[in-house]
Structure formats: structure tokens, C-alpha cells
Amino acid sequence: MAVMTFAAIDIGSYEVSMKIFELSKKIGFRELNDVRYSLELGKGVYSNGKLDTQMLDVLCETLNDFKRMMQDFGVVEYRACGTSALRELTNPLIIVEQIYRRTGFKVEILSNAEQHFLGYKSIAAIERGFKKMIQKGTAILDVGGGSLQVSLFDKDALVTTQSLKMGSLRIRQRLQELEKTTIHYDKLV
């Protein structure tokens, strides 16, 4: 296999990111570029299940910027995935179709299990000591914008995993709502 250039796009609750890699059998993979754009997609989604038009516009502009970068790097293949914010939309198919029409990107909405499986897979690929670390009882916490994932490993296997809808963006939203309705907010927190 010759060298191939691949882009991984993550549409998350509070950030849209893209990593571009060079892949080959000889060297494995090498990161060429890492771009992150702060965009709180989960903000409206977690409270009302909707992505407002302005937020969709900014998302599509960002993805079109990513597309130009991909062309500059000669990207041959890509994978664009949406997580919690897109997963919890009341109209995910309509939003994914809008993204496709406006950017040309086919976005795959990952289930919670798929999202975390890919996360562990990437940790295992990057962290040399990962396999050794999960031989003995190990907990991995993944704090995202929409959820907190707790996974327990033992003897090189995933024993159990639990996802709690307590991500940083959700908690911040709840605290902001609480602050508006509570007299002694500072004492409560």
C-alpha cells in the first residue's frame, strides 16, 4: 500500500475537530494536522432537542473550511462522525441531510457505544502501555460535553461501562438555569 492521506472529523457537543493522518504499512500512521473549532452544538440540543439555524450555518461553514484543508493536504478518504449533540436531536436525519447538501460530507451519527469503542481503540493505538494498564483493574473516565462515561477494565477486557448524562456542557446549562431561580446560588454550589 502506498501512502494514503485520511481525515477524521468529529462533530461533538462543544467542539468540531479534524485530524489529518498519513497512513502506510511501513510507518503506520502519522498525524499531519489537528484543527479544532469551539462550537457549542449541544447548547440548544440538550434543552430543546433542536439545532438552531445559525448554529447549523456555522457548522457548515466550519466543515467547508475543513474541506479546503483536506484538499490542500490531498486527503483521499475521510470519516465524519457526530456524537451526543447530533444523536439527541429530534430531527437528526434532516440535519444530516442539510449538512450533506451544504458541504458534501456524509456524517455518521455514532451510538454511545460506538463512540466510546472508537475512543478506546484510539487510546490503544497511541498509548504504548494501554494493554499492560488494563491487565489489572483500571477505570477510564471520559468527560464529554454531553455525558460522563465510566469504563472498568480488568484482565485485558472491558468489564462494564456506564454512561451518565452529566457532561460539562449539560452541567453548565443546569447550573445557569439554577442560578436564575435560586436566591443563595453561591451557597448552594
Regions found by a protein language model. Give the residues of each.
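Acidic, divalent-metal-coordinating active-site segment for phosphoryl/phosphodiester hydrolysis
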Residues: 146-149
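Primarily the dimerization/phosphotransfer
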Residues: 14
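Nucleotide/phosphate-binding catalytic cleft detector across ATP-hydrolyzing
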Residues: 1-11, 19-140, 151-189
